[in-house]
């Protein structure tokens, strides 16, 4: 396979070295566990967190005479993912044996796909930024392929001082290996790519993307070169299990390689591990080539074939994906591209927002979800699934603002009460006397008192109309934030003789 460089060198992404600029080249191999109740070639459960070796069939344990039987749901999930990646779906693919020895691989080989994967070339559009001007840049990252394969078991070396244990619960679980082209040029791009890929998988419902549970892991291929030169020798960083660690591992590895090259050395092609505690990579083994695994078609499995109707049926049932949803939010709800991007970044956030925005002003709903709800969740270290404020409750606050029952300032107080205590927004406002004062007479009385008590400020405001805001603030303070701000502003300007 020839590798084509499709990116134009960008000085913004160069890494300065002691002897000049360098460019980092990054490719990603993401292992995403297929959301399926059973494994790729057996009926054993895929439930996470079970007792060791509780979910192991005779096929998973490689007992003599046991033959693999393909799980149709896993095939469908792979095709759905390929469609979500705008990729070519191959109607005929072949399962191969990848031969190597490891204690947690009972067969002595892994069933994978080598030359004929189920999904071919595709693409992902990532958004990188903001830059110093607050601008975001869209970058297209190519997908080389997606193939199905079995996961291995898990070796545990910390349970006994003299023995290692093997848990085969994960053995045979279906994985999608999604291989990018070497189109990434910075750690920020790599993090944006992984974030976007995880979002797409979650929207599709083909992988839960829970990296802390091991259901999504990344192998990161890193090399450096002088801008515009040929690709350098790459090193692979295995099994990085968080987006933050992906960024850190790339930063360290690029600097490590640059230091070696600037010192006159050469990069050894090898597999490395990322030590999160030290923030550095370390050598694991020399990098294997494909011929080291002695790939050959699995004689126990026929070629996987399906027709166009099979693909079209899955395509017709696909959910709305992040890019399409973002475009709709901008077009139909009048949201900014930035706000729409934040809201579609996670399916759960988008679903929450749409529930709040239904029948309401989209911009108002977006402001409350992004600034107030997500801000509070971030401060509390909670996810959207853990929010104590439901879409109905947040929508209730927006309704109370719209009908003039409360001001925006009082709405913040209502939100805080809902966050800490729960309840119904309208009942909270009623029981705590938080209704906005709309009686013009009462507001006018407060305005007159503030003006009478501050003659010096009156003269200043008449000379400089922008100072009228000081009077508005004083009236709001005097009324405990309950006065209608628009009514206060109109009365202040009228009393001071300031034209609108």
Curated annotation (Swiss-Prot):
InterPro entries documented for this protein: Asn/Gln-tRNA_amidoTrfase_suB/E, Asn/Gln-tRNA_Trfase_suB/E_cat, Asn/Gln_amidotransferase, Asn/Gln_tRNA_amidoTrase-B-like, GatB, GatB_C_1, GatB_Yqey_C_2, Gln-tRNA_amidoTrfase_suB_CS
Keyword field contains ATP-binding: yes
Molecular function via GO: asparaginyl-tRNA synthase (glutamine-hydrolyzing) activity; ATP binding; glutaminyl-tRNA synthase (glutamine-hydrolyzing) activity
Pfam families listed in its UniProt record: GatB_N, GatB_Yqey
EC class name: ligase
EC number: 6.3.5.-
Reaction equation(s) it catalyzes: L-glutamyl-tRNA(Gln) + L-glutamine + ATP + H2O = L-glutaminyl-tRNA(Gln) + L-glutamate + ADP + phosphate + H(+); L-aspartyl-tRNA(Asn) + L-glutamine + ATP + H2O = L-asparaginyl-tRNA(Asn) + L-glutamate + ADP + phosphate + 2 H(+)
Keywords noted in UniProt: ATP-binding, Ligase, Nucleotide-binding, Protein biosynthesis
GO BP terms in the entry: glutaminyl-tRNAGln biosynthesis via transamidation; translation
Subunit structure: Heterotrimer of A, B and C subunits.
Role of this protein: Allows the formation of correctly charged Asn-tRNA(Asn) or Gln-tRNA(Gln) through the transamidation of misacylated Asp-tRNA(Asn) or Glu-tRNA(Gln) in organisms which lack either or both of asparaginyl-tRNA or glutaminyl-tRNA synthetases. The reaction takes place in the presence of glutamine and ATP through an activated phospho-Asp-tRNA(Asn) or phospho-Glu-tRNA(Gln).
Family under the similarity heading: Belongs to the GatB/GatE family. GatB subfamily.
HAMAP family to which the protein is assigned, alphabetical: GatB
NCBIfam families reported in the protein's UniProt record: gatB, PRK05477.1-2, PRK05477.1-4, PRK05477.1-5
The name this protein goes by in its record: Aspartyl/glutamyl-tRNA(Asn/Gln) amidotransferase subunit B
Organism annotation: Rhizobium meliloti (strain 1021) (Ensifer meliloti)
């Amino acid at each position: 396979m020839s590798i084509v460089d499709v990116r134009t060198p960008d000085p913004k992404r160069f890494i300065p070295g002691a002897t000049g600029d360098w460019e980092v080249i990054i490719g990603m191999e993401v292992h995403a566990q297929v959301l399926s109740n059973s494994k790729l070639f057996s009926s054993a459960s895929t439930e996470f967190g079970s007792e060791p070796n509780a979910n192991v069939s005779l096929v998973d344990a490689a007992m003599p005479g046991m033959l693999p039987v393909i799980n149709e749901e896993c095939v469908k999930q792979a095709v759905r993912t390929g469609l979500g990646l705008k990729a070519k779906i191959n109607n005929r693919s072949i399962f191969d044996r990848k031969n190597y020895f490891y204690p947690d691989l009972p067969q002595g080989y892994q069933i994978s796909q080598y030359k004929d994967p189920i999904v071919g070339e595709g693409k992902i559009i990532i958004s990188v930024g903001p830059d110093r001007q607050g601008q975001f840049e869209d970058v297209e990252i190519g997908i080389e392929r997606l193939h199905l394969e079995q996961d291995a078991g898990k070796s545990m070396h910390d349970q006994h001082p003299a023995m290692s244990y093997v848990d085969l619960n994960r053995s045979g679980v279906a994985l999608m290996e999604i291989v990018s082209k070497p189109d990434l040029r910075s750690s920020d791009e790599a993090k944006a790519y992984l974030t976007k890929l995880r979002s797409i998988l979650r929207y599709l419902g083909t992988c839960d993307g829970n990296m802390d549970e091991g259901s999504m892991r990344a192998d990161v291929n890193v090399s450096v070169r002088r801008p515009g030169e040929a690709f350098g020798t790459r090193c692979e960083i295995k099994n990085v299990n968080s987006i933050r660690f992906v960024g850190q591992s790339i930063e360290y590895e690029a600097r490590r390689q640059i230091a070696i090259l600037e010192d006159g050395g050469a990069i050894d092609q090898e597999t490395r591990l990322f030590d999160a505690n030290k923030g550095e990579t370390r050598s694991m083994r020399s990098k294997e080539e494909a011929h080291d695994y002695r790939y050959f078609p699995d004689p126990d499995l026929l070629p996987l074939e399906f027709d166009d109707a099979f693909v079209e049926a899955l395509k017709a049932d696909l959910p709305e994906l992040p890019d399409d949803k973002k475009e709709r939010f901008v077009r139909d709800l009048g949201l900014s591209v930035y706000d729409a991007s934040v809201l579609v970044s996670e399916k759960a956030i988008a679903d929450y927002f749409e529930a709040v925005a239904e029948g309401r002003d989209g911009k108002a709903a977006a402001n409350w979800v992004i600034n107030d709800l997500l801000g509070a969740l971030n401060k509390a270290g909670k996810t959207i699934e853990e929010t104590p404020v439901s879409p109905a409750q947040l929508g209730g606050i927006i309704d109370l603002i719209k009908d003039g029952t409360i001001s925006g300032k009082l709405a913040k107080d209502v939100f805080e009460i809902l966050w800490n205590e729960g309840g119904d927004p309208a009942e909270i406002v009623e029981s705590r006397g938080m209704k906005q004062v709309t009686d013009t007479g009462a507001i006018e009385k407060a305005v007159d008192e503030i003006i009478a008590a501050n003659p010096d400020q009156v003269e200043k405001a008449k000379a400089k109309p922008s100072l009228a805001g000081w009077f508005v603030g004083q009236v709001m303070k005097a009324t405990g934030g309950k006065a209608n701000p628009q009514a206060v502003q109109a009365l202040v300007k009228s009393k001071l003789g300031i034209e609108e």
